[in-house]
């Protein structure tokens, strides 16, 4: 076998007939497969052992030679080589065709490659290939032209007239002869000369032809190889035939297709030997052509060949295509051994880095390790014995299993794997039962719940894999989400509830006002029943000397509750005492108001600030903030411990609290009946006005909807004001543990208006709430919206998944390749603000974790706040914003100069670790996942603006994100200015239903016509710049790039993506959108090739374009000129330099056809192409800089160094010598 890790690149090309013969181990002459009686392969058939190798390991067909010792011998009786049966997966055969046939990929593709080379239309080609017309190959001295088509009648006529003075043929043979005649160099030179004069369609076709001819010339492929003289037969184990019970056979479709080819080929040979009439031979040749077409790509031309049940047969092309094809099914996603799957269950007693594995599952997964250990300990005498012990599940294997799984992490994965946190490593702990056990805080990252979800478990085997799992993938390290750098392990449900209850305060509880010297004294008092968790007490600050209490408070007494005292025991000793849930208290000592002044009575203090404590129990959001703050200060290890302690505390507190809910806890609303009666009165009034013709039907509908919406809001308002610290439902909602005000309104108030399946609202509201119960009609109306919700979610999941797939595909080769690309460019970061939506993203958010590109000075004083080339952290970013700086020059991915990746300085901080990104980080994949993963949270809606702005629809949510990344023409497109200047006048032309906006530029004046109903976004006298909107709507990036530059377009796409996500409450970091936007603008379109050998109109990589130009400039020639070219992500993924990656994405046959003609070379720089060939990916620890590290050798002591022992021995030897003398 080839060692994949050794080779650098992979090339594809056309196979010549001789190449196909050289691959082959023999010719397949008969259509037979297996003898149905003996079940042995037939001689010369499709499964022949002489050609493809033995079916049994090291045994020839007749049984004369059996065993490894005969390896390599060819049996003299049956002619089969003695070797492993595995060769049947790699040895190929061939079929010698009696007549040449064309390869359907090159004849049928768009554009037809054969047609371009010969300059013949695909329609004419088809007539020739399928024997409907003759084509003139050599006109001789007749009046005919080369490549002229003749019908049967015309051919006879010309033959009668000219005899043998011309040559015309039909079928693939004619095409082969014509292709042999093509002189590539001559054609290319002629076409280049023609291009100077051609225009329009002819020019486009000429460029296409030139492109193909050039490809043939440069790749060394010969055009006539597009016509096949021999057909390769793929190895039999890739098209197996198996016997089913009942004696029938199941076979791969390919065998049927090969049988048709062989049958027709043999028949044609026979007819040729018999010198049959030309017509019969032609008919057979056509049938052979069709058989080979069906084998290569069934259904591409004409009706597909069908098998039993009218099912089209799967041809070789279908074996590669689509989700079930070779690329996606077997090369990019393989099934692996040492894995299992089971239902998951919660296990609150686990540590954050642990998971529970059921004993029988662990035993099966770690079986080889247990066997080895049993033998090593002498419990089993040999491996066979050990295996028997495991199968019997003897008692002495469990201790060994416990020992074996120590220090061996396992990976847990939950489908759908939306981002990298969907696969994490845990240390296994053996548990009873059959379910995998998961830590409750890991659920958020997996989006897992315990209603029947299943997860898969995998065992890393090699030492390297174990080390990587432990150091890079352990769940305890994954505290921040790569999407935006905020903690992903926020506590939820019971944990939140418990800690909220724990930190509540009540005036007048038992033991109020007691003062304790130490926290331990308070605990004793609690255990004795003297105080409660909610009691307000005093504690001496001196008992916690490591904490920062602020100036002068080190020996004071502070007022807190016993619950908060307990809660603070979770924090590190030197962290502030958190007494109120504010950002200030997280970052600095507790406020002065909580300390007793000298001589002040504690009861007076409680009267003064008691209500402040009562009003501020710790809610869910604040618990998340504490995690962030602890992470910033103490990093992973300590945060992980804090999370486990927080979990333990939450669960135990919610148990002690005894919070339950019942019907009685749902409060009564006082004003609902009156509000509903008033609303009904108003609705009657509206209906009356409609009947009298004072309102249109639409106005009536809108008014009724408004009346009921206001009514529901009023009821909701009353419920929102109901805040009772004793009411369990209220506590759940306010703590953030479960439920929101809307759920509460539906329980206690009214459900309000329901949506119809089309998204309109029913005019009849649901007045009942769930406590009262719904009427039949109300229930029926509610079902529409509920079902729509379900279907929308299902559709959105599919849409979002496909978007993620395209994003990953386009960005997968973006890796951090170097430390600094040395660019002096960057972008100007300022707050992103939208006219309608307000602030989208603040300047602070855009600065954190980025490098500065210029020195930043205070706008007032001029002093330096931050110098150039500094990584801005939270403090620095806040300092810059506080100084009133409006825009900052930062290093950006958009302006990075690294080819095939990004440098560390342009990327900045890795959000998942809050440290500077490391070389080898696969930032492209992370970016794609970060954009795709929240896709399901975006809406699918297209909003109808109801007749404003030319009644266009403004696309939002997921469709808008797709529109941006695919660079499609947006819905509701805005007209933009092409010049810098002033708006001269805005005129309405009622007759033609248009408005005209005149923009006066410095050089010329432009007039733009806009729809009559559109509201201009500018006014007369406004100063505007290129690319500014003249009417509201979305700008088409393809237009924007023409009138402005690449960077402006990139910044526009970035701002729009941010708008789509942040308005839906998803905080996405800029850098992820930047990575993808950069991928869309990696290409340029050549306008004028200058003196380079590039074709006009060619689309190529910017880096390649610069290299070609550099060579020409050095030699003193005229360089080529090009313009920036924007590609949607699907197009960009197909245009990648790697044909393997493109072929495995979409349009497999087209990509491979093109790549083989061009003799493309895949440099294997991305991740997908390396996964496909089974090479370690060039990211992370697979980067050359890590792979090429040589382990340090043991230090050898030079000869001149002696130890004392050596010297003593030497002296001894010398003494002996002298004695012997």
Swiss-Prot record:
Catalytic activity: RNA(n) + a ribonucleoside 5'-triphosphate = RNA(n+1) + diphosphate
Keywords in alphabetical order: DNA-directed RNA polymerase, Magnesium, Metal-binding, Nucleotidyltransferase, Transcription, Transferase, Zinc
Chain segments annotated as coiled-coil in the UniProt record: none
Keyword match Chloroplast: no
Superkingdom of origin organism: Bacteria
Enzyme Commission (EC) number: 2.7.7.6
SMART domains assigned: RPOLA_N (SM00663)
Cofactor: Mg(2+); Zn(2+)
Record: residues binding Mg(2+): 449, 451, 453
GO biological process per UniProt: DNA-templated transcription
Entries under InterPro entries matching the protein: DNA-dir_RpoC_beta_prime, DNA-dir_RpoC_beta_prime_bact, RNA_pol_asu, RNA_pol_N, RNA_pol_Rpb1_1, RNA_pol_Rpb1_3, RNA_pol_Rpb1_3_sf, RNA_pol_Rpb1_4
Entry binding sites for Zn(2+) 1: 60, 62, 75, 78
Binding site for Zn(2+) 2: 821, 896, 903, 906
GO cellular component: DNA-directed RNA polymerase complex
Cofactor binding annotation: Binds 1 Mg(2+) ion per subunit.
Function of the molecule: DNA-dependent RNA polymerase catalyzes the transcription of DNA into RNA using the four ribonucleoside triphosphates as substrates.
Similarity comment: Belongs to the RNA polymerase beta' chain family.
Record note on quaternary structure: The RNAP catalytic core consists of 2 alpha, 1 beta, 1 beta' and 1 omega subunit. When a sigma factor is associated with the core the holoenzyme is formed, which can initiate transcription.
Protein name: DNA-directed RNA polymerase subunit beta'
């Amino acid at each position: 076998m080839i060692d994949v890790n050794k080779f650098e690149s992979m090339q594809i090309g056309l196979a010549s007939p001789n190449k196909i013969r050289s691959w082959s181990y023999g010719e397949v002459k008969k259509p037979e497969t297996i003898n149905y009686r003996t079940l042995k392969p037939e001689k010369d058939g499709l499964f022949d052992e002489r050609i493809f190798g033995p079916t049994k390991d090291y045994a020839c067909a007749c049984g004369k030679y059996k065993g490894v010792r005969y390896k390599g011998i060819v049996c003299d009786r049956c002619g089969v080589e003695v070797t492993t049966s595995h060769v049947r997966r790699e040895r190929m055969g061939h079929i010698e065709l009696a007549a040449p046939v064309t390869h359907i990929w090159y004849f049928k593709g768009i554009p037809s490659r054969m047609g371009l080379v010969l300059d013949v239309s695909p329609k004419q080609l088809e007539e020739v290939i399928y024997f409907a017309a003759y084509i003139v190959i050599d006109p001789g001295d007749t009046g005919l032209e080369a490549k002229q088509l003749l019908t049967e009648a015309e051919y006879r006529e010309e033959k009668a007239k000219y005899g043998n003075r011309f040559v015309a043929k039909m079928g693939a043979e004619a095409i082969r002869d014509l292709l042999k005649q093509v002189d590539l160099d001559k054609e290319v030179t002629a076409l280049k000369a023609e291009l100077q004069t051609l225009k329009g369609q002819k020019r486009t076709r000429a460029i296409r032809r030139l492109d193909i001819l050039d490809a043939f010339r440069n790749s060394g492929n010969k055009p006539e190889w597009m016509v096949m003289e021999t057909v390769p037969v793929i190895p039999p184990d890739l098209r197996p035939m198996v016997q089913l019970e009942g004696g029938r056979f199941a076979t791969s479709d390919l065998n049927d297709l090969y049988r048709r080819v062989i049958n027709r080929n043999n028949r044609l040979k026979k007819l040729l030997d018999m010198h049959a009439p030309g017509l019969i031979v032609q008919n057979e040749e056509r049938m052979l052509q069709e058989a080979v077409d069906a084998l290569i790509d069934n259904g591409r031309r004409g009706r597909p060949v069908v098998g039993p049940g009218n099912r089209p047969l799967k041809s070789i092309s279908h074996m590669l295509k689509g989700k079930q094809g070779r690329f996606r099914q077997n090369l990019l996603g393989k099934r692996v051994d040492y894995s299992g799957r089971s239902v998951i269950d919660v296990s609150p007693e686990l540590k954050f880095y642990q998971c529970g594995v059921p004993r029988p599952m662990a035993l099966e997964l770690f079986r080889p390790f247990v066997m080895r250990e049993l033998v090593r300990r002498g419990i089993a005498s040999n491996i066979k014995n050990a295996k028997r012990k495991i199968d019997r599940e003897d008692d002495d294997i469990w201790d060994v299993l416990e020992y074996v799984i120590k220090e061996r992490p396992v990976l847990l994965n939950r489908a759908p794997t939306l981002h990298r946190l969907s696969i994490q490593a845990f240390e296994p702990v053996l548990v009873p039962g059959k379910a995998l056990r998961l830590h409750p805080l890991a659920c958020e990252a997996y989006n897992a719940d315990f209603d029947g979800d299943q997860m898969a478990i995998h065992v890393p085997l090699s030492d390297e894999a174990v080390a990587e799992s432990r150091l890079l993938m352990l769940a305890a390290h994954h505290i921040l989400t790569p999407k935006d750098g905020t903690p992903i392990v926020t506590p939820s449900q019971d944990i939140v509830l418990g800690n909220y209850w724990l930190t509540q305060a009540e005036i007048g509880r038992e033991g109020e006002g007691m003062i304790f010297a130490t926290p331990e004294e308070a605990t004793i008092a609690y255990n004795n029943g003297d105080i409660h968790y909610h009691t307000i007490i005093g504690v001496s600050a001196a008992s916690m000397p490591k904490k920062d209490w602020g100036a002068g408070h080190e020996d004071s007494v502070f007022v807190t509750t016993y619950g908060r005292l307990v809660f603070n025991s979770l924090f590190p000793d030197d962290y502030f005492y958190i007494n109120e849930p504010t950002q200030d208290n997280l970052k600095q000592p507790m406020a002065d108001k909580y300390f007793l002044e000298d001589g002040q009575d504690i009861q007076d203090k409680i009267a003064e600030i008691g209500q402040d404590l009562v009003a501020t129990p710790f809610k869910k959001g604040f618990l998340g903030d504490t995690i962030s703050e602890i992470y910033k200060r103490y990093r992973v290890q300590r945060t992980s411990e804090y999370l486990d302690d927080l979990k333990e505390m939450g669960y135990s507190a919610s148990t002690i609290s005894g919070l339950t809910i019942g019907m009685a806890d749902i409060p009564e609303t006082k004003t609902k009946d009156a509000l509903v009666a008033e609303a009904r009165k108003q609705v009657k009034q509206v209906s009356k006005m409609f009947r009298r013709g004072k309102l249109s039907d639409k106005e009536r509908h809108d008014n009724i909807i408004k009346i009921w919406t206001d009514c529901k809001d009023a009821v909701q308002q009353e419920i929102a004001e109901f805040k009772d610290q004793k009411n369990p439902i209220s506590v759940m909602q306010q703590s953030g543990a479960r439920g929101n005000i809307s759920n509460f309104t539906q329980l206690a108030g009214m459900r309000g208006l329901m949506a119809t399946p089309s998204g309109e609202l029913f005019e009849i509201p649901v007045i009942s709430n769930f406590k009262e119960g719904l009427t039949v009609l109300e229930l029926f109306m509610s079902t529409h919206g509920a079902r729509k919700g379900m279907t929308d979610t299902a559709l959105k999941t599919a849409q979002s998944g496909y978007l993620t797939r395209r994003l990953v595909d386009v960005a997968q080769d973006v890796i951090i390749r170097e430390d600094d690309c040395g660019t002096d460019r960057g972008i100007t970061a300022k707050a992103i603000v939208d006219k309608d939506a307000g602030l989208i993203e603040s300047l602070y958010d855009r600065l954190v974790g980025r490098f500065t590109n210029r020195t930043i000075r205070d706008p007032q004083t001029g002093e330096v706040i931050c110098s150039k080339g500094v990584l801005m952290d939270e403090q620095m970013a806040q300092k810059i914003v506080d100084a009133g700086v409006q825009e900052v020059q930062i290093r950006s991915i958009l302006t990075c100069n690294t080819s095939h990746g990004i440098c560390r300085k342009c990327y900045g901080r890795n959000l998942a670790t809050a440290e500077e990104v490391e070389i080898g980080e696969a930032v492209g994949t992370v970016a794609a996942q970060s954009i795709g993963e929240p896709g399901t949270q975006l809406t699918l809606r297209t909003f109808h603006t109801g007749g404003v702005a030319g009644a266009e629809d403004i696309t939002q949510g997921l469709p808008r994100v797709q529109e941006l990344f695919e660079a499609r023409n947006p819905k509701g497109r805005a007209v933009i200015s092409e010049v810098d200047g002033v708006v001269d006048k805005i005129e309405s032309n009622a007759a033609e239903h248009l408005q005209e906006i005149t923009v006066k530029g410095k050089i010329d004046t432009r007039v733009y016509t806009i729809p009559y109903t559109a509201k201009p976004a500018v006014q007369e006298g406004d100063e505007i710049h290129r690319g500014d909107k003249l009417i509201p709507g979305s700008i088409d990036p393809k237009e924007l790039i023409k009138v402005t530059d690449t960077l402006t377009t990139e910044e526009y796409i970035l701002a729009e993506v941010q708008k789509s996500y942040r308005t839906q409450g998803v905080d996405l970091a800029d850098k992820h959108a930047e990575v993808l936007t950069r991928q869309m603008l990696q290409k340029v379109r050549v306008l004028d090739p200058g003196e380079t050998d590039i074709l006009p109109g060619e689309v190529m990589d910017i880096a390649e374009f610069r290299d070609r130009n550099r060579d020409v400039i050095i030699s003193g020639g005229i360089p080529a000129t090009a313009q920036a070219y924007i590609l949607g992500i699907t197009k960009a993924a197909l245009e990648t330099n790697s044909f393997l990656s493109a072929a495995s994405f979409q349009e497999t046959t087209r990509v491979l056809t093109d790549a083989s003609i061009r003799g493309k070379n895949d440099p294997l720089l991305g991740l997908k192409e390396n996964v496909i060939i089974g090479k370690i990916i060039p990211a992370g620890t697979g980067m050359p800089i890590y792979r090429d590290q040589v382990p340090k050798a043991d230090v050898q002591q030079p000869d001149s160094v002696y130890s004392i022992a050596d010297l003593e021995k030497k002296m001894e030897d010398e003494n002996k010598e002298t004695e012997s003398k």
